[in-house]
Amino acid sequence: MRDRFTVRNKVVTESSAKLDPDLLFVYGTLRRGLGLHHHLKRMGAEFVAIGRVQAEIFDLGEFPGARKSGKPGKAVEGELFRLHNAEKTLRVLDQVEGISARNPGRGLFERGTVEVALPNGERRLAWIYWFR
C-alpha cells in the first residue's frame, strides 16, 4: 500500500507551484499543543491540514530543526496553517525564531518556502522556518 503522504522527488519552481503567502508549514514547537503554538493561536492562524515536506529533521535539544533534503524518502510531518494577517504574523514569528531584519543570516533559522504534500494528494507551496 502506498503511503498517502509520499513526497516525490521534484524540483519546485515558480512554474510548478505558486506560493500562497498566507500558508505556513510548522514541524516543531509551533505545532498545536506545543510550547510556541500560542503565537499562532493569538494571531488567529487557522489549522488547514497535516502535511509532509521533503526534508530531514534534527534534534537540537529543546526543539527540532528541519533542512531540505534531496534524499528520496526523507520526509518531515507537520501542520499547515492559514495566516489571517500573514505579514504581521510572520514578523512576530521571525522574532520568535530569532530572525533579525538588521542581521539576516545570523540566527539558527531562516524563513523560506517548501512544497507541502497533503493527505488528499494536493500540493501547496508555503512558508517554513528552515534550520541553517
Residue spans of the language-model regions?
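Glycine-aromatic micro-motifs
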Residues: R2-R132
